[in-house]
Amino acid sequence: MAYLLDTGVISELRKPHCDPGVATWMAGIQPDEAFLSVLSLGEIRRGIELHRPKDPKAAGALERWLLGLEAHYAERILPITTAIADRWGRLCLSQPLPVSDGLIAATGLEHKLTVVTRNGSDFQRSGVNTLNPFS
Protein backbone atom coordinates (compact mmCIF):
# COMPACT_ATOMS: atom_id res chain seq x y z
CA MET A 1 0.00 0.00 0.00
CA ALA A 2 1.16 3.57 -0.60
CA TYR A 3 0.24 6.83 1.09
CA LEU A 4 0.12 10.56 0.40
CA LEU A 5 0.90 12.47 3.60
CA ASP A 6 -0.92 15.76 4.00
CA THR A 7 0.73 18.81 5.52
CA GLY A 8 -0.78 18.27 8.97
CA VAL A 9 0.73 14.79 9.23
CA ILE A 10 4.14 15.94 7.96
CA SER A 11 4.15 18.79 10.47
CA GLU A 12 3.09 16.49 13.31
CA LEU A 13 6.13 14.29 12.68
CA ARG A 14 8.39 17.28 13.36
CA LYS A 15 6.97 17.95 16.83
CA PRO A 16 9.04 16.92 19.86
CA HIS A 17 5.92 15.27 21.32
CA CYS A 18 4.43 13.82 18.15
CA ASP A 19 1.01 12.23 18.48
CA PRO A 20 1.67 8.58 19.46
CA GLY A 21 -0.75 7.27 16.84
CA VAL A 22 1.06 9.15 14.08
CA ALA A 23 4.50 8.03 15.32
CA THR A 24 3.40 4.39 15.59
CA TRP A 25 1.72 4.40 12.19
CA MET A 26 4.71 6.02 10.48
CA ALA A 27 7.12 3.53 12.10
CA GLY A 28 4.99 0.69 10.74
CA ILE A 29 5.29 1.56 7.06
CA GLN A 30 8.22 1.31 4.69
CA PRO A 31 9.83 4.64 3.70
CA ASP A 32 9.09 4.01 0.02
CA GLU A 33 5.35 3.79 0.81
CA ALA A 34 5.09 7.47 1.83
CA PHE A 35 4.74 10.28 -0.71
CA LEU A 36 4.41 14.07 -0.50
CA SER A 37 2.64 16.54 -2.75
CA VAL A 38 4.42 19.65 -3.96
CA LEU A 39 1.41 21.46 -2.46
CA SER A 40 2.47 20.41 1.04
CA LEU A 41 5.97 21.72 0.40
CA GLY A 42 4.43 25.00 -0.74
CA GLU A 43 2.27 25.21 2.39
CA ILE A 44 5.33 24.61 4.57
CA ARG A 45 7.32 27.24 2.64
CA ARG A 46 4.48 29.72 3.16
CA GLY A 47 4.58 29.03 6.91
CA ILE A 48 8.33 29.61 6.97
CA GLU A 49 8.02 32.94 5.20
CA LEU A 50 5.22 34.04 7.54
CA HIS A 51 7.50 33.28 10.53
CA ARG A 52 10.62 34.88 9.07
CA PRO A 53 9.88 38.56 9.95
CA LYS A 54 8.82 37.70 13.51
CA ASP A 55 11.31 34.95 14.34
CA PRO A 56 14.17 34.50 11.86
CA LYS A 57 15.80 31.81 14.00
CA ALA A 58 12.64 29.66 14.01
CA ALA A 59 12.21 30.28 10.28
CA GLY A 60 15.78 29.09 9.72
CA ALA A 61 15.12 25.90 11.67
CA LEU A 62 11.95 25.27 9.68
CA GLU A 63 13.81 25.91 6.45
CA ARG A 64 16.48 23.34 7.35
CA TRP A 65 13.70 20.88 8.16
CA LEU A 66 12.03 21.58 4.78
CA LEU A 67 15.32 21.02 2.94
CA GLY A 68 15.69 17.73 4.81
CA LEU A 69 12.17 16.70 3.76
CA GLU A 70 12.94 17.55 0.15
CA ALA A 71 16.11 15.45 0.27
CA HIS A 72 14.50 12.51 2.11
CA TYR A 73 11.42 12.33 -0.13
CA ALA A 74 13.24 13.41 -3.33
CA GLU A 75 11.84 10.79 -5.71
CA ARG A 76 8.56 10.59 -3.77
CA ILE A 77 7.50 14.23 -4.17
CA LEU A 78 4.59 14.29 -6.57
CA PRO A 79 4.02 17.22 -8.93
CA ILE A 80 0.70 18.48 -10.23
CA THR A 81 0.61 16.92 -13.68
CA THR A 82 -1.86 17.57 -16.47
CA ALA A 83 -3.61 14.28 -15.57
CA ILE A 84 -3.99 15.44 -11.96
CA ALA A 85 -5.22 18.86 -13.06
CA ASP A 86 -7.75 17.19 -15.34
CA ARG A 87 -8.97 14.90 -12.55
CA TRP A 88 -9.20 17.88 -10.18
CA GLY A 89 -11.26 19.82 -12.71
CA ARG A 90 -13.71 16.94 -13.02
CA LEU A 91 -13.88 16.44 -9.23
CA CYS A 92 -14.68 20.08 -8.63
CA LEU A 93 -17.68 20.03 -10.93
CA SER A 94 -19.55 17.49 -8.86
CA GLN A 95 -17.91 17.94 -5.45
CA PRO A 96 -16.71 21.48 -4.72
CA LEU A 97 -13.54 21.35 -2.62
CA PRO A 98 -10.95 23.90 -1.53
CA VAL A 99 -8.27 24.05 -4.24
CA SER A 100 -5.42 22.48 -2.24
CA ASP A 101 -7.61 19.69 -0.81
CA GLY A 102 -9.03 19.01 -4.26
CA LEU A 103 -5.58 18.80 -5.84
CA ILE A 104 -4.29 16.53 -3.06
CA ALA A 105 -7.37 14.31 -3.49
CA ALA A 106 -6.84 14.24 -7.26
CA THR A 107 -3.17 13.33 -6.72
CA GLY A 108 -4.18 10.48 -4.42
CA LEU A 109 -6.76 9.21 -6.90
CA GLU A 110 -4.42 9.51 -9.88
CA HIS A 111 -1.61 7.60 -8.14
CA LYS A 112 -3.93 5.21 -6.23
CA LEU A 113 -2.64 6.52 -2.89
CA THR A 114 -4.43 6.72 0.45
CA VAL A 115 -4.38 10.28 1.79
CA VAL A 116 -3.12 10.31 5.37
CA THR A 117 -4.78 13.19 7.18
CA ARG A 118 -6.38 14.26 10.42
CA ASN A 119 -9.19 15.83 8.37
CA GLY A 120 -10.71 12.94 6.46
CA SER A 121 -14.00 14.79 6.13
CA ASP A 122 -12.19 17.39 3.98
CA PHE A 123 -11.55 14.66 1.39
CA GLN A 124 -14.62 12.44 1.83
CA ARG A 125 -16.59 13.92 -1.06
CA SER A 126 -13.74 13.28 -3.50
CA GLY A 127 -13.84 9.51 -3.20
CA VAL A 128 -10.14 9.22 -2.32
CA ASN A 129 -9.29 6.70 0.41
CA THR A 130 -8.18 8.36 3.65
CA LEU A 131 -6.54 7.23 6.85
CA ASN A 132 -6.40 9.11 10.16
CA PRO A 133 -3.40 7.94 12.23
CA PHE A 134 -3.99 10.39 15.09
CA SER A 135 -4.76 8.90 18.52
Sequence positions of predicted segments:
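Acidic-residue sensor for enzyme active/binding pockets
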Residues: 12, 43, 110
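Residues that scaffold the ATP/ADP-binding catalytic core of kinase and kinase-like folds
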Residues: 12-13, 25, 47, 87-91, ...
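Active-site neighborhoods of divalent-metal-dependent phosphate/nucleic-acid chemistry enzymes
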Residues: 46-51, 60, 71-118
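Short, well-structured N-terminal submotif of metal-dependent ribonuclease cores
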Residues: 1-40, 50-68, 125
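Residues at the C-termini of beta-strands that transition into short coil/loop
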Residues: 38-39, 81, 119, 134
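Acidic, PIN/NYN-like endoribonuclease modules and their adjacent C-terminal/linker elements
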Residues: 1, 105, 109-135
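General small-molecule cofactor/ligand-binding pocket signal
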Residues: 35, 78, 131
